[in-house]
């Protein structure tokens, strides 16, 4: 659930113009209006402590930019430059540049884990349902017997994921510091963005190369599919709690009896 909450707050870069940096000005803004336009309070501070002026301006959204609610005005720190930015940040959680940078990467990795998780839930259950596989429910997979005990599996998983996550964290703190292959040092990556390592291991088909418009389109699709996957995993979890069966079994039951096998049946008295 935390990943779903995080996905709704990530969007773009902080509001900063070259002129404001050149004049040493600090731009303070009010919270974004949840729906419509708003007025922003802009305070400019000069390099001398005695010279101070304040002005009020109106910020208009780009009419061609897709927004989460048509006609709404996005907050200034969401300028549409990041993939999946539709101007949605009613709580202002992305207003701080450092928080935005961290939350952007947090959403990205949660999206990817959720897509893997959704595939691990739906595909084996569907193949088991039609008789191709014979796998346990995802909800009880941790109770099964494996080639070793679960404690050993957990420790091995913790070490491997900890190493990978440590390198990812280092790349966030200092971009480009992990672009050299730790096993084959002659293999180096250049021109990559944080969160998108590319190369043979992470982009074997070369989809991450091309025009900026194409790259942003693919990254936006990844974010949108990841957000949907986070909702799907959360939905499958709640579904199993209330029905005791998986999503594919629930789907087949609904198709067999659409008038009675619905979401409301879980809350109706037996």
Curated annotation (Swiss-Prot):
Chain sites annotated for binding chlorophyll b 1: 68
Cellular component GO terms, alphabetical: chloroplast thylakoid membrane; photosystem I; photosystem II
GO molecular function: chlorophyll binding; metal ion binding
Record-listed chlorophyll a 5 binding positions: 221, 239
Family annotation (InterPro entries): Chloro_AB-bd_pln (IPR001344), Chloroa_b-bind (IPR022796)
Record: transit peptide: 1-42
Binding-site residues for chlorophyll b 2, renumbered to this chain: 112, 155
Domain of life: Eukaryota
Membrane-spanning segments: 113-133, 146-166, 228-248
Residues holding chlorophyll a 4: 225
Positions with a binding annotation for chlorophyll a 2: 110
Description of post-translational modifications: Photoregulated by reversible phosphorylation of its threonine residues.
Cofactor note: Binds at least 14 chlorophylls (8 Chl-a and 6 Chl-b) and carotenoids such as lutein and neoxanthin.
Primary location group: plastid
UniProt topology in membrane: Multi-pass membrane protein
Binding site for chlorophyll a 3: 144, 222
Keywords noted in UniProt: Chlorophyll, Chloroplast, Chromophore, Magnesium, Membrane, Metal-binding, Phosphoprotein, Photosynthesis, Photosystem I, Photosystem II, Plastid, Thylakoid, Transit peptide, Transmembrane, Transmembrane helix
Positions of chlorophyll a 1 binding: 88, 107, 227
GO biological processes: photosynthesis, light harvesting in photosystem I; response to light stimulus
Ligand binding (chlorophyll b 3): 165
Function: The light-harvesting complex (LHC) functions as a light receptor, it captures and delivers excitation energy to photosystems with which it is closely associated.
Record's subunit section: The LHC complex consists of chlorophyll a-b binding proteins.
Domain-level remarks: The N-terminus of the protein extends into the stroma where it is involved with adhesion of granal membranes and post-translational modifications; both are believed to mediate the distribution of excitation energy between photosystems I and II.
Protein name: Chlorophyll a-b binding protein 7, chloroplastic
Organism listed in the record: Solanum lycopersicum (Tomato)
Native organism taxonomy: Eukaryota, Viridiplantae, Streptophyta, Embryophyta, Tracheophyta
Name of the encoding gene: CAB7
């Amino acid at each position: 659930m935390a990943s779903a909450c995080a996905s709704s707050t990530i969007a773009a870069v902080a509001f900063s113009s070259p002129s404001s940096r050149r004049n040493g000005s600090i731009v303070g803004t009010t919270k974004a209006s949840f729906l419509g336009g708003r007025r922003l309070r802009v305070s400019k501070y000069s390099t001398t402590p005695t010279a101070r002026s304040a002005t009020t301006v109106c910020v208009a959204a780009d009419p061609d930019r897709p927004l989460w609610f048509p006609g709404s005005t996005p907050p200034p720190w969401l300028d549409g430059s990041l993939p999946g930015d539709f101007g949605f940040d009613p709580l202002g959680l992305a207003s701080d540049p450092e928080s935005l940078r961290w939350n952007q990467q947090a959403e990205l990795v949660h999206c990817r884990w959720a897509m893997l998780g959704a595939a691990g839930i739906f595909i084996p259950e569907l193949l088991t349902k039609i008789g191709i596989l014979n796998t346990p429910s995802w909800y009880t997979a941790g109770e099964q017997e494996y080639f070793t005990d679960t404690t050993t599996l957990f420790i091995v998983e913790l070490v491997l994921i900890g190493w990978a996550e440590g390198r990812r964290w280092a790349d966030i703190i200092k971009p480009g510091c992990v672009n050299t292959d730790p096993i084959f040092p002659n293999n180096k990556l250049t021109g990559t963005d944080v969160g998108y390592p590319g190369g043979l291991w992470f982009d074997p088909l070369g989809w991450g190369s091309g025009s900026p418009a194409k790259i942003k389109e693919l990254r936006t699709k990844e974010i949108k599919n990841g957000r949907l996957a986070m909702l799907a995993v959360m939905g499958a979890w709640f579904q199993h709690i209330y029905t005791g069966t998986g999503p594919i079994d629930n789907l087949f039951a609904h198709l067999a009896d659409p008038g009675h096998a619905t979401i409301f049946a879980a809350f109706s008295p037996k």
